[in-house]
Amino acid sequence: MKIAVEGCMHGELDKVYDTLRELEKAEGVKIDLLLCCGDFQAVRNENDLQCLNVKPRFREMKSFWKYYSGQAVAPYPTIFIGGNHEASNYLWELYYGGWAAPNIYFLGFAGVVKFGNIRIGGLSGIYKQQHYHLGHYERPPYNENTIRSVYHVRHYDVLKLMHVKEPLDIFMSHDWPLGITEYGNWQKLIREKRFFEEEVNKRTLGSEPAARLLNKLKPPYWFSAHLHCKFPAVIQHGEGGPTTKFLALDKCLPRRGFLQVIDIPSGPGPHEIQYDEEWLAITRKFNNVFSLTRMPFTMLDEQVDTQDDLQWVRNKLNARGAKPIDFVQTAASYDPSCQASNPSITVHCRNPQTESFLQLLNLPYLLDSSNSYGVSRNESSSQTGQALDSDDIELPDDEDDPADDDD
């Protein structure tokens, strides 16, 4: 199976798909799957643009709306995770994962799926210590603080991934695991990106939770993006233990290392995206401690037995199959023929995919403000939040600088 992996998409679906078509023709190969490591920018319309953490003058519609509306169809099954430049309102609709557009699947804030017999896991967002132990308290409409914190990685999602026991083939994170530069040519990295030198030397470049997941999951492949450069590394997990091939990729620009194709042995098929029964069992077990306020998330016993839930899920999937629930549009698509109008206030929309997914697992819907576990929309939009640090400086997307390490 040939899998293409792309770094930061930044809404350039047309360009990436065109590049893959050209590669297929030039190399005489067939691409079976595309993976994207974040900053996908699934922007459907002007309202979604307001939920994208990019300065207004740099906000662009790009090309995702074509695939959402049906004007274009993704030529390859596509799986993506979230980064720190996303239409966060739309991804929150699909917190557990789901079709963002036909043939384009969001892995969720954390998730595992199967493609054929290949297991693919991922963690969306970037790590910021000040929000890591909080619940998912942010709701649209976002203010200047919650538009930044909504995509910050949470302990709750990492803990779920730490309970994955069956081997994964591929894992994706947006930011790099902490300390990964020690396993590659870090000297070359800082020659090309001088502004990383201090963080590399102090061993502060990257995500500590991602490093813990790397040491726990030990997947053969780990892909990241975020820092707009290509960086390979090989991690040996103990003497005689398994190895992980790590690769960070750039954003979609000419003469940049934004794309890599790997060949993984696989079964005969069908090569389609399917639910992963172990991940569904973990999701079912952890949903009753899903924190949706600013209160810190804590668990007295971090080792949770999911065997009963796993058997329950197996019985359920044996009855209905493992194919995900079909794509459903929940908002009007951008229309370039219409004059731009003032965006309306964005509020949470219950996505029928998510509702059906929760019904499948016999779980309550907790993502909006109409339940006692969450916070009201007014509360979330008026939170003053924590003071911004130096990483909160927004840089234009085309500068060759740590633009994506802004918050």
Curated annotation (Swiss-Prot):
Spans annotated as Lariat recognition loop:
124-154
The compartments listed are: Nucleus
One Gene Ontology MF term: metal ion binding
The terms describing its cellular component in GO are: nucleus
Q: What controls its activity?
A: Active in presence of diverse metals including Fe(2+), Zn(2+), Mn(2+). Binds two metal cations in two adjacent alpha and beta metal-binding pockets.
Top EC class, one word: hydrolase
Instruction: Tell me which cofactor or cofactors this protein depends on.
Output: Fe(2+); Zn(2+); Mn(2+)
Q: Where is this region: Disordered?
A: 373-407
Q: Write the protein's name.
A: Lariat debranching enzyme
